[in-house]
Amino acid sequence: MPKHGKKYRKATEGTEQIGLTVEQAVASAVEKAYAKFDETVDVAINLGVDPKYSDQMIRGAVTLPNGLGKEIRVACFVSGEKEAEAKEAGADFVGGDDLVAKVKDGWLDFDKAIATPDMMAKVGQIGRVLGPRGLMPNAKTGTVTFDVASAVKEVKAGRVEFKVDKAGVLHAPIGKVSFGAEKLLENLKSLLETVNKLKPSSAKGTYMKAVAVATTMGPGFKIDPLAARKYSES
């Protein structure tokens, strides 16, 4: 078991508490942050779903009201008049065959990718490169669309894509420690509301089984699942 430094051990004091309110958990995560850089605040949600069934594979996206606190570099795989639309909306890299070829040569200097439906056959050629890195455009998350301008603006504004893993756990960032508790809570509420709306009818029992908030270097703070659900519905 790895040994943690004094700062981490000090930060973990009191984290054995469970059943915190949403407000308590977020405030504690911010208060206990100790790194010299502006840490990202992440949320882990254990859902009562079985991802091996396609109708229980929770996947989606949400535009956080306060963004993520970082510049998102967007690559748009488009052609024709859509190129000008993408550039005007603020896309960092725009192209068709040339952009696909660039990725084939090893270029991956972007954070999100958007494509029009007619370009997906060509983008599929680099699926093995984009997929494992979470960069593959997907219609379910709104990154395969003819409305390129809206997609670019949403991603730039702090649109977060999420997907449950094999264990049914969903991970997503909700901002930076420097945001302060109030803005982080607003972002978390948007995330919880979106996840709650995606509950499949085939999922039985408790949907939000466990929720925890943690900073990049800090410990996790467990939120009472019932409190999380009520917060998402308030």
Swiss-Prot record:
InterPro entries: Ribosom_uL1_bac-type, Ribosomal_uL1, Ribosomal_uL1-like, Ribosomal_uL1/biogenesis, Ribosomal_uL1_3-a/b-sand, Ribosomal_uL1_CS. One of its GO terms (biological process) is regulation of translation. One of its GO terms (molecular function) is rRNA binding. One of its GO terms (cellular component) is cytosolic large ribosomal subunit. The keyword Repressor applies. Keywords: Repressor, Ribonucleoprotein, Ribosomal protein, RNA-binding, rRNA-binding, Translation regulation, tRNA-binding. PANTHER family: 54S RIBOSOMAL PROTEIN L1, MITOCHONDRIAL (PTHR36427), LARGE RIBOSOMAL SUBUNIT PROTEIN UL1M (PTHR36427:SF3). Part of the 50S ribosomal subunit. Belongs to the universal ribosomal protein uL1 family. Binds directly to 23S rRNA. The L1 stalk is quite mobile in the ribosome, and is involved in E site tRNA release. This is Large ribosomal subunit protein uL1. It comes from Maridesulfovibrio salexigens (strain ATCC 14822 / DSM 2638 / NCIMB 8403 / VKM B-1763).
